[in-house]
Every structure is written in structure tokens, then in C-alpha cells.
């Protein structure tokens, strides 16, 4: 019977094959080998590679044992065999060995004649799993890159093999050194020193993020370890002042004879300065090359004056640069090794150390710079706070003015705030606060006056979004709360009134779109509702000033709740948010599911109330409405002018050249935003229907003006057409 017939028979009788494979006729070792071959074949097909199980999966490993013994002095070959072993154990050829040494990372490949070739890695492929191999000093000497998925068991196998391999590599190197006549104790000491260096480098890294107090603290740490690292008697660290071509040190021993070089810098700190053209440290700073001098007095760059003054004898010097991105930022000079001269090993150790201490010095320098900037910022903030809060004379002047117990005219939306003087507005703002909260909230009257006056001072003198507008919106909320006293809790009413008074603090007369388009600093701080978030932060800043916290009598919980409500209310004045709030409320009201006691419904109601009060000019008597619209559009035109100056075309509403379209634009604004807002408020609070009625009246008046303007435009166009015909 030929092979084909046997294969056909087995395919037709799979149960017979299965029974035979799992029977005692097949040894466990053979079964396992078959399973490995099957797994490897599956992985190779999946990854588009081919290959067998390999010598490492065979029962007899004597050949591999001989290879390891014969190549024990060849680290690269040992690492290659480890890689092949790992690949064959988990059944994949999709692996790559990356060997690391002082010159960089190299990919290891086996040529057709069996030789190993190293190729510099420029760009590494993305591996599914990377297993590192480290030496006794915990330094990475190789990586095995797997370009196939490994499960947890396979990863454990690879990790175990590489752990044993790392230990084997150590003993292999130890054996090689002994064969060459090296002292094994030296190797142990070298490994201990490497471990010590690694631990310190970790310590330096920690200090960068945790222990940085000042540049001086980091310098002392660097000097102390540099001295211990190479077993030097003394160590000095000089920083480079490239602007003045000098090196300087702030940490020094005045007993070394350097007193004549001591200067006091602009910050009142003592420091030693030398020209970079002088001395050994200057040479290293200028060239970026390290110097290992066995006899200082034989080097012409050495200045022996210091020794003659102090009686100290300099013998050996190791002077090394500290670099960041190839630029020398400092120089460490180590003097007189305790035992002999500085070695190449000392130089190598310091080169590694220099990378980390360069990073530490760089961060410390940044820290010092940030700390100085912070101090300047605090001074500036202190000066700003002084000039942005009201003074004692203003407070005393307002305190002395007597006011009626009740001002009935303030309780209607029709009240004209434009006729109030600059003194009366804050006086009436205080009155409205007291009227609303005198019976339910403990507050200091002087703090309240101070708060209101400072709020006034922090509104900018722009055409519309100024103190007069803030006062008008607060008055609208006052009138609304007086007409619906039970609609909100006292904390909610407090948040609503304070929010209205402060809702446009520090407004610059430009909208959010302008802030984002022009990439202003505020737009970089806040991603959404730019100005509204700034207004809220300004409110909090004022509340935090001494003698301004009108909420200080609240409990901690109530204070947090009130601040949260103030933030919610001020952000709600962003008209971009109104449309989603309107849509949600309309659905709730249309479905007859509105419940003022539900938190979600209350927040939506408060948001729409804020919008209604912010737009209150559209619900004022016609004469107040027209006067307000003039200043609104003047501010719009100012923004449009600024946009045009920067090369951008403003929208028609902000284009001064489209001023004749004002009535038509107002109709769109009144019908598209104002009326829907007041319709919602009237559905929730029928007593506040007057705002809707007044807004409807004003909208019709604007429609009449828009129609008149349209007729004028048509007549003018007709006249121009007739004139052109006459000329022809």
C-alpha cells in the first residue's frame, strides 16, 4: 500500500486516527513534540512564515550544549541561541534579536554560511511583544522582538528562559575573565559599582520630580556624588553663561583661595566667575571635550595660584562636560583621586552620570525660573488686586446714604436703569440683595457694599457689556424673583441674583467666536464658553478677596452648592447653550412631564431664566429698547472693525457697512431667540408673562421699521434704475 492510499484511508477514518494518537502506543514525549509542531505550523501560516520546530525542541540537546560551550566567550552568539530557543519553544519564526551596546542598537541576522551579522537599527518595526535581557548590573543588553501575539503562558516561558540566560551570561563573562587572568573580585566590584551608579541615577531621576527645591540643592547633590563616583578628594561644578562667555559657581568652599573671584550677582547671591578662555574648566566648557590630567602641574592650562595661596596640592584632575542636546551647560571638575589616577572606567561612569545630572540641572534651572516667575506673578497679582478692588472711601460714602425701606418701582421689569447715577446703581444693587435675603441669610453689610462696588470696578468700559448691563440683568432677576417668591429655594435665588450681577465681569466687548478665531489667551485657557467661564472665575476671584465674601456665613456644603449653581447660571448665559436648553424644555412641557421639583427640570428652568434676564432689553419699553440696541450694535461694529483690520470679513450683524439692515437683523434676533425664550418662561411662570408681551410688542415695532427700510431700499433702487436709463 502506497503513502497516498494510507493518507486517504486515515482521512476517511478520523476516529481511528484519534484513538491511535491518544492511546498508550504514543509516548507523552512524542505527543508533546507533535503538539508543538502543530502549534508552530499554525502560527507560521497565520503570520505568513514557514519553519519547523527546530533543534531546541528535540529530545536530544547534546548538539546545542556543545554549541553553547564552544561559544561561551561570544555574547552575541549566546544571545542568538537564546532567541532561537524562545522562538522554537512557542512555535514561531517571527522573531528578531536586537543587540544593544555602547554604539547603539543592532539587529542580529544569520547569513547563509552560518555567520552572525549585526546591522544598525535606524527605525524599528512595531513588535507585538518585546522581551528584554539584562545583565547583572540591570542594564539591557538585548531585546527579543516577537511579531506575533503571545498568550500569558508563552510570555512566562520566554521570561523564564531569558532570566536564566541573563544569569548564564554573567557567569560566562566571569569565566572568560578568569581564563584571561582577570581577578574575579574586580568583576564583582565593577558590577557592584554599576549597581550603585544605577541606584543613584534613579535617585537623581526622583529628585527631578520630587526633591527639587532649588538649583543649589541639585548642584550640591551632583557634586557630592561626582566626588564619590570617582573617589576624588574634591569636586566643583561650574555652570556655563554662554551670553558672557563665562563659567560660574554658586556652591564653593571659600577656604580654597577663590575669594578674589567672588562676586555678588543681580539676585544678591555670591558666585565665582571665570572667563571660558581660562583654566581647565574653561577649556572643557569651550570645547565640550573631557580632560583626564595625570599631572596638573605639567599642563599649561592649569592655574597653580590657587594651590600656592591655600597650600593645597593638586595632582590629578578629571574635568568632564555636562551637555543638553549637544550644548555644554556645565562642567564638573574632580581633583585628586585618592588611589592613583583617574581611569578610563571613571570617565565612562561619569559620561553615563552626566546625562542624568544634565537633565537634573536643566529641570532645576527651569524650576528656578518658574519660581521667580511665580514670585513676580504674585507681586503683579497683589498690585492688580489693590487696583481692582474698591477703596474704603467708596464704601464709607455708600454706607452713609439712606434709602427707603421699599422701592416699589424696582419690582417691575419696566424700570429704566439708564436714568440712575453711578452712585445709585450700586446703592440699588445692595438694596435688592437685602430685600431678597435679609430675612434668610446672614451677611455683613460692609462686605456686601464692598462686593458690589468691586464688581462694578471689574466691568470694563465697553459699549454694552458693562456695569450698566450687569446691573440691568440683576434687576430683571430681582423683579422675577419678587413676582415668583416661592419658585426657587433661597440658595438658588441667591445664586441666580449674584450670577446676574456678575455674569459679564471683565467682558472685552468681543464674543466667543472672536476669541477663538483670534487665538486669544483666554481661548487657549477655555475650550468652550470662553467668556462665560472667565466671568465665573472673575466672580470667584472677587469672592476670595478680603472683606468681599458675601457667602461666608453659609455652611461648607451650602457654600459649595451655591458656587456650583453660580457656575451653572453664568455658563447658561452663553447663547450657544440656549438652543439645546430650549429644545429639552419644550419636549418636557409638550409631554406634560414638567416637574419643578425635579433637579434636572429646575436646572433647565434656571438656565432659561438667566437667558431671559440677559436679554431683558428686548422686553423693556420701546424707548429703552431702542436706546439699548444702539449701544449693542456699536459694540458689534467695534468687533467687526477689529476683524476687518485683521483681514477677516465680519458677519452682517457686526459689519458697520450693513448698518441700514439693523431693523431686519433685530427682527430675526427677536423672533429667533428672544420670543422663544419668553414663551418658555411664561409657560413655566405665568406671572412673568409681561416679558413675553413686551417682547412681542417690540418685535412688531422692529418689523414695521424693517418694512419701511425695505420700501426705502426698493424706492432707491428704482430711482437709480431710472437715472441710469436717462443717462443711456
From Swiss-Prot:
Active-site residue list: 465 (proton donor)
Q: Where is this region: Disordered?
A: 708-728
Q: Which residues form a coiled coil?
A: 691-728
Relay the cofactor remark from the entry: Binds 2 divalent metal cations per subunit. Site 1 may preferentially bind zinc ions, while site 2 has a preference for magnesium and/or manganese ions.
Could you name the domain of life of the organism this protein comes from?
Eukaryota
Question: What functional role does this protein have?
Answer: Redundantly with pde-1, plays a role in the AFD thermosensory neurons to regulate microvilli receptive ending morphology, possibly by regulating cGMP levels.
The protein's name is Probable 3',5'-cyclic phosphodiesterase pde-5
Organism listed in the record: Caenorhabditis elegans
Which gene carries the instructions for this protein? pde-5
Amino acid at each position: 500500500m502506497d503513502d497516498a492510499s494510507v493518507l486517504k484511508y486515515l482521512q476517511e477514518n478520523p476516529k481511528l486516527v484519534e484513538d491511535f494518537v491518544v492511546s498508550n502506543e504514543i509516548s507523552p514525549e512524542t505527543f508533546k513534540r507533535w503538539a508543538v509542531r502543530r502549534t508552530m505550523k499554525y502560527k507560521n501560516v497565520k503570520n505568513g512564515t514557514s519553519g519547523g520546530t527546530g533543534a531546541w525542541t528535540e529530545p536530544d540537546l547534546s548538539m546545542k550544549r556543545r554549541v553553547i560551550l564552544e561559544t561561551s566567550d561570544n555574547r552575541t552568539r549566546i544571545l542568538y541561541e537564546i532567541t532561537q530557543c524562545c522562538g522554537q519553544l512557542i512555535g514561531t519564526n517571527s522573531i528578531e534579536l536586537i543587540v544593544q551596546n555602547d554604539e547603539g542598537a543592532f539587529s542580529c541576522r544569520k547569513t547563509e554560511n552560518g555567520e552572525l551579522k549585526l546591522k544598525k537599527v535606524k527605525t524599528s518595526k512595531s513588535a507585538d511583544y518585546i522581551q528584554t535581557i539584562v545583565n547583572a548590573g540591570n542594564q539591557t543588553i538585548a531585546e527579543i522582538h516577537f511579531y506575533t501575539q503571545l498568550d500569558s503562558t508563552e510570555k512566562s516561558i520566554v521570561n523564564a528562559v531569558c532570566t536564566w540566560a541573563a544569569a548564564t551570561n554573567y557567569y560566562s563573562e566571569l569565566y572568560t575573565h578568569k581564563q584571561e587572568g582577570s581577578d574575579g573580585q574586580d568583576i564583582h566590584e565593577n558590577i557592584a559599582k554599576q549597581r550603585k551608579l544605577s541606584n543613584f541615577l534613579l535617585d537623581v531621576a526622583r529628585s527631578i520630580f520630587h526633591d527639587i527645591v532649588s538649583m543649589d540643592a541639585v548642584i550640591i547633590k551632583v557634586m557630592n556624588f561626582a566626588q564619590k563616583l570617582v573617589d576624588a578628594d574634591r569636586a566643583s561644578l561650574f555652570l556655563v553663561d554662554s551670553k558672557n562667555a563665562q563659567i560660574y559657581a554658586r556652591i564653593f568652599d571659600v577656604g580654597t583661595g577663590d575669594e578674589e573671584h567672588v562676586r555678588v550677582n543681580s539676585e544678591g547671591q555670591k558666585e565665582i566667575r571665570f572667563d571660558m578662555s581660562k583654566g581647565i574648566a574653561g577649556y572643557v566648557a569651550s570645547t565640550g571635550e573631557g580632560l583626564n590630567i595625570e599631572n596638573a602641574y605639567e599642563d599649561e592650562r592649569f592655574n597653580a595660584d590657587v594651590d600656592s595661596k591655600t597650600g593645597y596640592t593638586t595632582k590629578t584632575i578629571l574635568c568632564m562636560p555636562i551637555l543638553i542636546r549637544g550644548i555644554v551647560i556645565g562642567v564638573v571638575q574632580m581633583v585628586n583621586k585618592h588611589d592613583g589616577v583617574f581611569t578610563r572606567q571613571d570617565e565612562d561612569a561619569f559620561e553615563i552620570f552626566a546625562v542624568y545630572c544634565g537633565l537634573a540641572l536643566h529641570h532645576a534651572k527651569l524650576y528656578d525660573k518658574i519660581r521667580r516667575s511665580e514670585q513676580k506673578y504674585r507681586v503683579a497679582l497683589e498690585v492688580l488686586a489693590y487696583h481692582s478692588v474698591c477703596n474704603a472711601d467708596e464704601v464709607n460714602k455708600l454706607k452713609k446714604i439712606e434709602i427707603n425701606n421699599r422701592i416699589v418701582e424696582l419690582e417691575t421689569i419696566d424700570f429704566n436703569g439708564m436714568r440712575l447715577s453711578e452712585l445709585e446703581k450700586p446703592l440699588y444693587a445692595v438694596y435688592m440683595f437685602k430685600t431678597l435675603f435679609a430675612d434668610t441669610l446672614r451677611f455683613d453689610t460692609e462686605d456686601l457694599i464692598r462686593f458690589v462696588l468691586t464688581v462694578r470696578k471689574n466691568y470694563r468700559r465697553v459699549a454694552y457689556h458693562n456695569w450698566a448691563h450687569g446691573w440691568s440683568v440683576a434687576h430683571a432677576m430681582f423683579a422675577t424673583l419678587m413676582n415668583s417668591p416661592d419658585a426657587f429655594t433661597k440658595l438658588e435665588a441667591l445664586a441666580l441674583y449674584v450670577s446676574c450681577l456678575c455674569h459679564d465681569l471683565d467682558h472685552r466687548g468681543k464674543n466667543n467666536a472672536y476669541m477663538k478665531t483670534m487665538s486669544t489667551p483666554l481661548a487657549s485657557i477655555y475650550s468652550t464658553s470662553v467668556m462665560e467661564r472667565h466671568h465665573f472665575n472673575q466672580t470667584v476671584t472677587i469672592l476670595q478677596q478680603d472683606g468681599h465674601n458675601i457667602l461666608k456665613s453659609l455652611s461648607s456644603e451650602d457654600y459649595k452648592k451655591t458656587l456650583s449653581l453660580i457656575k451653572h447660571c453664568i455658563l447658561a448665559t452663553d447663547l450657544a447653550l440656549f438652543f439645546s436648553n430650549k429644545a429639552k424644555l419644550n419636549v418636557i412641557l409638550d409631554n406634560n412631564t414638567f416637574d419643578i421639583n425635579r433637579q434636572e427640570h429646575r436646572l433647565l428652568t434656571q438656565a432659561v431664566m438667566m437667558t431671559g434676564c440677559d436679554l431683558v432689553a428686548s422686553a423693556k419699553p420701546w424707548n429703552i429698547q431702542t436706546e439699548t440696541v444702539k449701544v449693542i450694535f456699536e459694540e458689534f461694529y467695534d468687533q467687526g472693525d477689529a476683524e476687518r483690520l485683521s483681514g477677516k470679513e465680519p458677519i452682517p450683524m457686526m459689519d458697520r457697512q450693513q448698518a441700514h439692515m439693523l431693523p431686519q437683523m433685530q427682527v430675526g434676533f427677536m423672533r429667533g431667540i428672544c420670543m422663544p425664550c419668553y414663551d418658555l418662561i411664561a409657560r413655566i411662570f405665568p406671572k412673568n408673562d409681561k416679558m413675553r408681551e413686551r417682547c412681542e410688542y417690540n418685535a412688531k415695532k422692529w418689523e414695521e421699521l424693517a418694512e419701511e427700510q425695505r420700501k426705502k431700499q426698493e424706492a432707491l433702487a428704482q430711482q437709480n434704475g431710472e437715472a441710469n436709463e436717462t443717462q443711456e
